């Protein structure tokens, strides 16, 4: 895939622009970080050249001048919400985030529990856990009338009931495990607390998507709409920016809806607002670092199709209606893409049709397509991985990397001792067997050395993957989709 984004140019421009905003504010700046600070896989998929750690690398330029505050919604703790991309709970992700920030040399010692109510026992337990770990925890309550009653919100009965976070640096980055965590309210509550203490402070937003200086229906912006289809977010033209500057800028519904209130709050807190529009609040320079628009458009279309398949599978797993996939289908239509644009889909379905059993296909980074079929020894995903490694290593397809003699003892262990009904090897078992074989086989060693070249490849399977295969593909960095059907009929399914 062609590079479409200049990582180094972005880091340089973005850090400079944040400093310019700090000078404009002239005091403490609370910077709300939308999206993922690191592990930003979505951005890396739709902007080829953007690395998952791009934003944190940019902030490293400002490391000695900032501190990081993590917000988490108490209701998300009660719901045991998880990060789907990492398959960990928000609770654990807060700890993971702080660990990574500290390993990179950032000051991170504060957590804000937002929208806490007295019966949020899970959140209260988590608060105690954080405090035992030496972290400072501030509690923000549910404020009646938020976010519409500005006069009450900006008062002792509003933000005044929240605990104030004593920050020590003039750039405070507010981040969270996911959307809806209360980052904006945390920033505004802190500005209120600063105002009560005579401290000058302001607010800015760093949201990667939608990209304000790309057209409303640019595929990169549409890919963001597909990614947030479960939140019912939509991209819109910023009406305030258009009125103030007679210039079109892309924003999204929640920012536009909250802007009048935000502007009013800033005026009540500091006498005036520096912003005429939601776009003005942002400091995003991502659009200015795109160097190949066509490459980014194609990458974004592929991401939209992947999101569509993910929605179909999620709806099948959870036995939900097709609301989210239907929304993404509309986005696909706007972007001018279909499932046929994902080349691996047709090839995987061809394998299933010709064999009468589940099939799998992968598109290598040079465009070659490799398939895998279900056999008595291997599941189709495991077979596909072996075939792809052989293709990459230049090993003839007829060569067996694993002998039946090495596979059969593993099958016996699974079915006779570990209670598995399925004797076929999963991808993890195949890779372990291949690693063992590599000790004595030059051919197996050559194949294993190609494992790193699967990263970023597209895969499609004709049945919903089990958790093991799904986890292995995630760890390998493979972009996998599935047809929304199971291999066998059953009511109970292990996850």
Swiss-Prot record:
It holds the Pfam family DUF1846_C. Gene3D superfamilies: dip2346 domain like, Domain of unknown function (DUF1846), C-terminal subdomain. Signal peptide: none annotated. Belongs to the UPF0371 family. HAMAP family: UPF0371. This is UPF0371 protein cgR_2887. It comes from Corynebacterium glutamicum (strain R). The lineage of its organism: Bacteria, Bacillati, Actinomycetota, Actinomycetes, Mycobacteriales.
């Amino acid at each position: 895939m062609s590079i479409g984004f200049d990582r180094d140019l972005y880091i340089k421009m973005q850090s400079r622009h944040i400093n310019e905003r700090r000078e404009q504010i002239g005091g403490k700046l609370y910077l709300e970080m939308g999206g993922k600070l690191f592990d930003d896989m979505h951005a890396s998929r739709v902007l080829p050249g953007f690395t998952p750690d791009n934003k944190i690398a940019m902030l490293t330029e400002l490391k000695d001048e900032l501190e990081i505050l993590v917000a988490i919604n108490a209701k998300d703790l009660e719901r045991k919400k998880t990060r789907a991309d990492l398959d960990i709970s928000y609770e654990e992700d807060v700890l993971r985030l702080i660990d990574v920030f500290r390993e990179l040399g950032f000051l991170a010692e504060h957590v804000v529990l937002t929208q806490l109510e007295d019966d949020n026992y899970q959140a209260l337990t988590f608060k105690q856990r954080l405090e035992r770990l030496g972290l400072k925890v501030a509690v923000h309550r549910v404020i009646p009338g938020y976010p519409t009653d500005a006069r009450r919100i900006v008062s002792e009965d509003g933000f005044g009931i929240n605990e104030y976070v004593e920050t020590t640096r003039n750039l405070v980055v507010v981040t969270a495990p996911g959307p809806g965590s209360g980052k904006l309210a945390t920033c505004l509550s802190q500005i209120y607390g600063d105002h009560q203490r005579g401290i000058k402070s302001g607010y800015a937003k760093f949201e990667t998507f939608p990209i304000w200086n790309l057209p409303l229906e640019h595929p990169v912006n549409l890919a963001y709409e597909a990614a947030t289809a479960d939140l019912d977010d939509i991209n819109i033209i910023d009406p305030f920016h258009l009125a103030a500057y007679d210039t079109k800028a892309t924003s999204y519904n929640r920012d536009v809806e909250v802007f009048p209130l935000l502007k009013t709050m800033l005026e009540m807190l500091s006498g005036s607002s520096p912003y005429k529009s939601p776009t003005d609040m942002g400091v995003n320079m991502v659009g200015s670092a795109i160097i190949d628009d066509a490459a980014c458009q194609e990458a974004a279309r592929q991401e939209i199709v992947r999101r569509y398949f993910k929605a179909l599978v999620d709806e099948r797993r959870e036995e939900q209606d097709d609301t989210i996939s239907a929304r993404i289908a509309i986005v696909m239509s706007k972007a001018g893409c279909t499932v046929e644009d994902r080349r691996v889909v047709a090839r995987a379905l061809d394998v299933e049709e010709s064999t009468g059993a589940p099939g799998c296909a992968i598109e290598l980074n040079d465009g070659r397509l490799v398939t895998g079929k279900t056999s008595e020894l291997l599941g189709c995903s495991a077979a596909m991985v072996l075939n792809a490694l052989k293709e990459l290593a230049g090993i003839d397809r007829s060569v067996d990397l694993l002998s039946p003699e090495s596979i059969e003892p593993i099958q016996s262990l699974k079915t006779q001792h570990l209670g598995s009904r399925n004797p076929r090897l999963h991808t993890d078992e195949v890779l372990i067997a291949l690693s063992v074989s590599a000790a004595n086989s030059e051919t197996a060693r050559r194949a294993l050395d190609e494992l790193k070249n699967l990263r970023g490849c597209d895969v499609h399977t004709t049945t919903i993957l089990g958790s093991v295969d799904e986890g292995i593909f995630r760890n390998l960095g493979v972009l996998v989709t599935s047809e929304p059907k199971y291999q066998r009929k059953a009511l109970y399914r292990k996850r």
